[in-house]
């Protein structure tokens, strides 16, 4: 089995967001398969971290330095994409047909040099492909869920008082548009 360096802005024990929870499930699955996973916050990544690790997963990387992004481009890394970090606002929905003008695309070389860019759905992958024009984009076909969270969802679905209802999760993250969902 291999050693894996897992880079993300935050982890689930720091911020319980959707991307962070997905990362945690992935890390657990890797542990169960015998891999050693070392988690490092993106703003704490050092040159030696990149030098000493052959297999790297980069998740949310807003806080990753430009120098580290450049150095990673000569390494064996994949991007586990939770949103659209090739756009300054990370929301392709503000563009016609979800297609941003070329001058709005950022981090393209970082995506291009990745062995793969793993997107959470076919819709997500199609939008990323349309904007980045890359062949290394892959759809995972959905999110990763822990058994605990799947159990909670199953229980909610069994409750007749909760049928035919919906929920909006509060988020202060601008591109998630919580206010728009409420209105």
Predicted regions, residues:
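Short hydrophobic "strand-cap" motifs at the C-terminus of beta-strands
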Residues: 7, 120, 168-172
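Conserved catalytic-core segment of nucleotide-activated headgroup transferases in glycan assembly
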Residues: 152-183
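N-terminal pre-catalytic "stem/leader" segment of glycosyltransferase-like enzymes
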Residues: 1-63
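A short, active-site helix/loop in glycosyltransferases that binds the activated sugar's phosphate group
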Residues: 112-137, 144-146
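Membrane-proximal helix-turn-helix segments that form the acceptor-binding/catalytic region
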Residues: 96-117, 126
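Short, conserved loop/helix-junction motifs that constitute active-site signature segments
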Residues: 69-75, 108-113, 160-161
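Short beta-strand->alpha-helix junction loop in the catalytic core
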Residues: 139-155
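Active-site proximal beta-strand in glycosyltransferases
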Residues: 55-58, 72-101, 118
